[in-house]
Amino acid sequence: MAKKSMVAKWKRGSKYKVRKYNRCHICGRPRAVYREFGLCRVCFRKLASEGKLPGVKKASW
């Protein structure tokens, strides 16, 4: 989990528009964030397995 201070800092916005930091919208994790969904791999997997992400299904071949 991200530190509460980092999440608060991220939600507040930045001084410059160039400073964009990809974080998970749910937990605030800074790494392994899917841009298309705005979620980290952990939250993505959890929501996808629960069926809460439309158009996402488990791969099988």
Curated annotation (Swiss-Prot):
Binds 1 zinc ion per subunit. Part of the 30S ribosomal subunit. Contacts proteins S3 and S10. Its cofactor is Zn(2+). Transmembrane segments: none annotated. It comes from Kosmotoga olearia (strain ATCC BAA-1733 / DSM 21960 / TBF 19.5.1). Binds 16S rRNA, required for the assembly of 30S particles and may also be responsible for determining the conformation of the 16S rRNA at the A site. This is Small ribosomal subunit protein uS14. Keywords: Metal-binding, Ribonucleoprotein, Ribosomal protein, RNA-binding, rRNA-binding, Zinc. GO terms for cellular component: cytoplasm; small ribosomal subunit. GO terms for molecular function: rRNA binding; structural constituent of ribosome; zinc ion binding. It comes from the Bacteria. HAMAP family: Ribosomal_uS14_2_B. Belongs to the universal ribosomal protein uS14 family. Zinc-binding uS14 subfamily. The keyword ATP-binding does not apply. Zn(2+) binds at C24, C27, C40, C43. The keyword rRNA-binding applies. The lineage of its organism: Bacteria, Thermotogati, Thermotogota, Thermotogae, Kosmotogales. One of its GO terms (biological process) is translation.
